């Protein structure tokens, strides 16, 4: 543990030196042959909802962030995926209907999820050297089979709009010789993730259960369980190439949180985890995630003791906190630091662990 804290301090000092010399934050090329699971990036909580700081979603992407977050609702009347924080029947966000990169910073906002994903794809294609982007989707009210808004249709939807920029579960499973690991867990523990540099201009999508479905539905029907079962079924049928996203386990902690799922056959289909940053650091031993090459997303970076401002800490403090969480094994560090000077941390990509 002491060694990890020393490493965090060294990373923080390094970050300060970078800032002092006005050098850009680390990019994928600076990390040698590190895989996606061996780096830590910084992201923006509820990216779609920060219209005052980011008039358009592309403005947030322009910061060099490694993670954006979208909240989506299955609209029970229209059968469309809305993107908003609290409106289940309409979209309220900074996404536009873009067809080219020239459209990303103009036009009507408040579009549905398809347009948000289009914006991301178009931006990534216009920035092919940019480091990989994690797209975190909170599915507020989950899937809705009665409307056909199920994992199968969601796969097709995501693939249609992210296209060739998407890194999929099948990509993780596939070895260099073309053969495949039997499940995501085995592939992750073998560190079969692509090199971070090779994923420049690519997106990885994780989905998490939404606050609404957690409040009203039994855990057995949440999107994490439903999608893991979907992955298992696709693999058994030999059609895993159809899968588009990675289900994430909420509440990452020192002990494997997948044990909460009563069906142990689903466990190998979870390799992405989500945690509160304060709880993550407080657990004291989260190296298990790093050692097994699982991806981890930690939220509310400001809330680790000593707590920082949730919106505008000094750049020095923000960089030190990101370095601390990277040393503690976080893959993606989600923040609300969207104003200067703290937003200077958003483009940082550090060595993990």
State the predicted function of each range.
Residues 1-28:
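Secretory targeting and sorting signals
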Residues 29-353:
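Catalytic cores of phosphodiester-bond hydrolases, prominently lipid phosphodiesterases
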């Amino acid at each position: 543990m002491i060694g990890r804290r020393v490493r965090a301090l060294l990373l923080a000092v390094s970050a300060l030196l970078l800032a002092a010399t006005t050098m850009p934050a680390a990019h994928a090329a600076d990390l040698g042959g590190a895989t996606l699971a061996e780096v830590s990036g910084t992201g923006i909580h509820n990216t779609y909802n920060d219209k005052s700081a980011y008039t358009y979603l592309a403005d947030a992407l322009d910061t060099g962030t490694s993670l954006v977050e979208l909240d989506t609702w299955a609209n029970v009347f229209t059968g469309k995926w809305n993107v908003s924080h609290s409106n289940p029947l309409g979209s309220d966000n900074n996404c536009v209907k873009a067809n080219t990169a020239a459209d990303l910073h103009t036009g009507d906002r408040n579009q549905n999820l398809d347009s948000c994903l289009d914006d991301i794809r178009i931006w990534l294609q216009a920035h092919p050297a940019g480091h990989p982007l994690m797209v975190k989707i909170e599915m507020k009210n989950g899937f809705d089979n009665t409307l056909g808004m199920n994992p199968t249709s969601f796969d097709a939807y995501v693939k249609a709009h992210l296209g060739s920029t998407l890194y999929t579960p099948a990509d993780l499973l596939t070895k260099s010789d073309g053969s495949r690991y039997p499940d995501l867990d085995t592939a992750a523990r073998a560190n079969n993730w692509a090199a971070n540099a090779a994923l420049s201009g690519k997106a990885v999508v994780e989905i998490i259960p939404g606050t609404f479905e957690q409040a009203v539905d039994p855990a057995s029907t949440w999107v994490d369980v439903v999608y893991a079962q979907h992955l298992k079924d696709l693999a058994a049928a030999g059609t895993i190439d159809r899968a588009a996203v990675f289900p994430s386990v909420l509440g990452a902690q020192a002990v494997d949180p997948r044990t909460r799922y009563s069906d142990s056959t689903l466990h190998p289909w979870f390799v992405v985890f989500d945690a509160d940053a304060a709880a993550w650091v407080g657990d004291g031993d989260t190296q298990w995630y790093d050692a097994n090459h699982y991806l981890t997303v930690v939220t509310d970076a400001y809330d680790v003791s000593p707590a920082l401002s949730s919106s505008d800490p000094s750049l020095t403090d923000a960089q030190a906190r990101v370095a601390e969480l990277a040393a503690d094994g976080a893959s993606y560090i989600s923040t609300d630091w969207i104003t200067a000077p703290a937003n200077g941390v958003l483009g940082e990509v550090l060595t993990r662990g």
